[in-house]
């Protein structure tokens, strides 16, 4: 099977597993949420926030270094596995011993015990970091997707059974641990690595992984900066308005890019020594991503008044402008995310960190200025600062990937032109349907948008459907 076929198979299997797992998770959550108290979810949310940040440090990007490395010896893998165990178990012990501080800050002794038990995740993760990385390195996406689905199913069922037994908050904690245990066991069983606790010769892996881990920690700050700024200067209702608007706008991106990046990273790592082929595949991927993301996200922006009215209700009318603005920028953010994943895939972790620092400087500064004009000012600052960040980071990323910026622009051009016409037609259609009920107006505008976009993008790029058929055939091979 060619690398292209493996990548397409990965998208198919990963996407299918994510969809099935998400549906099952939602179904179980709807039952469990009626059995537990809101405080139970609050305690677990605080614990999860702490564990997730420390886990980024403990993992130290070692898994990514295994996937990205051009060549690896068995002894090196064994040493990386040993280092992963030492780091995770040590930091897990530190967090567990520091858990009593949670009582001081939050005044809840249950949180202390939840954090301490949740630290078992560090021990489980340590055992599977290298085996999981090996599975992705070999691009065995069918197996990785199956493991994630099985582990998610176990976690959901364990949580449900424990909740039915009256376990309270421990249903969430132990259910998550059950899924993590199964996940680690399956990866370890399929790609066993015996750890060696000698760490010589790992400087390159530690440098790459440490840089990547630092970048991830910085992204934690960047991703929360707007909400923290809003919480400091705006009312709680305004914060809720902003966060819900951004959540709606970024939800498609989170779902799609979680799948795409999981496949893009190992694929780029495999192609890093064949730059012409990498360039061709990356530009093709950006073109197809824009073909899908532009009509979806610009469509959401165009019909934002109807979406807000039907999904959120009249009290959320002020969410229309934030949703419109944010949705317009998401296709560019998605393309940038693919490029960012690609530069890590070719080993340029330092450049990824430099790009993250640009985000860390520009975005929070813009938020502090924009928040003076409330929610609309904050989302406008988000959009304008994102344009600045892309202008500063994308050109140098393309240079590192040996891809001309003009070629990237050409790959996005046709969907953007068709999307722009679609947007204008939908806005004109809304004016013509001003007196029609929201639900009928929304359905009509969606159909009008599709009727405009699909023929126009086909006219601008006559090969797009042939490309899609070719990819579909390759994914079945």
Q: For the regions a protein language model found, what residue spans apply to each?
A:
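Membrane-interface junctions at transmembrane-helix termini in multi-pass inner-membrane proteins
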Residues: 4, 8, 68-73, 123-147, ...
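N-terminal membrane topogenesis motif
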Residues: 1-26, 67, 72-82, 111, ...
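Interhelical loop/hinge segments that connect adjacent transmembrane helices in multipass membrane
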Residues: 1-3, 7, 142, 146, ...
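Hydrophobic alpha-helical transmembrane segments
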Residues: 112-119, 147-192, 204, 208, ...
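Transmembrane helical elements of multi-pass membrane transporters/channels
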Residues: 10-25, 172-175, 179, 183, ...
């Amino acid at each position: 099977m060619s690398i292209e076929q493996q990548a397409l198979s990965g998208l198919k299997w990963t996407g299918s597993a994510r969809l099935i797992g998400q549906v099952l998770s939602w179904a179980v959550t709807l039952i469990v949420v009626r059995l537990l108290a809101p405080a139970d979810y609050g305690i677990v949310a605080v614990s999860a926030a702490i564990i997730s940040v420390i886990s980024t440090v403990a993992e130290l990007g070692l898994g990514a270094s295994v996937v990205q490395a051009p060549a690896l010896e068995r002894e090196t893998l064994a040493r990386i596995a040993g280092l992963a165990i030492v780091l995770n178990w040590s930091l897990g012990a530190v967090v567990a011993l520091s858990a009593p501080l949670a009582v001081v800050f939050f005044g809840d002794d249950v949180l202390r015990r939840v954090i301490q038990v949740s630290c078992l995740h560090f021990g489980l993760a340590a055992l599977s970091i290298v085996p999981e990385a090996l599975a992705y390195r070999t691009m065995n996406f069918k197996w990785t997707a199956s493991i994630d689905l099985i582990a998610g199913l176990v976690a959901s069922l364990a949580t449900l059974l424990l909740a039915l037994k009256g376990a309270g908050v421990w249903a969430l904690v132990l259910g998550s641990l059950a899924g993590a245990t199964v996940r680690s066991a399956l990866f370890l069983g399929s790609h066993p690595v015996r750890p060696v606790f000698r760490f010589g010769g790992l400087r390159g892996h530690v440098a790459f992984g440490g840089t990547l881990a630092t970048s991830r920690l910085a992204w934690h700050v960047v991703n929360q900066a707007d909400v923290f700024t809003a919480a400091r200067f705006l009312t709680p209702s305004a914060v809720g308005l902003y966060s819900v608007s951004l959540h709606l706008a970024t939800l498609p991106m989170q779902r799609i890019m979680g799948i795409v990046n999981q496949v893009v990273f190992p694929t780029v790592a495999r192609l890093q020594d064949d730059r012409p082929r990498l360039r061709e595949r990356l530009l093709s991927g950006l073109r197809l991503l824009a073909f899908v993301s532009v009509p979806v996200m610009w469509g959401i922006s165009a019909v934002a008044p109807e979406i807000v009215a039907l999904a959120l209700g009249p009290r959320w009318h002020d969410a229309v402008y934030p949703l419109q603005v944010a949705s317009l920028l998401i296709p560019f953010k998605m393309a940038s995310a693919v490029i960012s994943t690609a530069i890590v895939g070719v080993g340029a972790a330092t450049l990824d960190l430099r790009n993250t620092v640009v985000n860390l400087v520009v975005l929070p500064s813009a938020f502090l200025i924009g928040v003076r004009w409330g929610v609309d000012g904050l989302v406008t600052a988000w959009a304008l600062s994102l344009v600045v960040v892309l202008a500063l980071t994308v050109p140098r990323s393309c240079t590192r990937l040996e891809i001309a910026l003009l070629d990237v622009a050409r790959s996005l051009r046709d969907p953007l032109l068709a999307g722009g016409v679609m947007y204008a037609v939908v806005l004109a259609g809304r004016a013509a349907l001003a007196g029609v009920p929201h639900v009928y107006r929304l359905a009509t505008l969606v159909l009008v948008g599709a009727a405009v976009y699909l023929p126009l993008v086909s006219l601008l790029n006559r090969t797009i459907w042939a490309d899609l058929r070719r990819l579909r055939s390759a994914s079945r091979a």
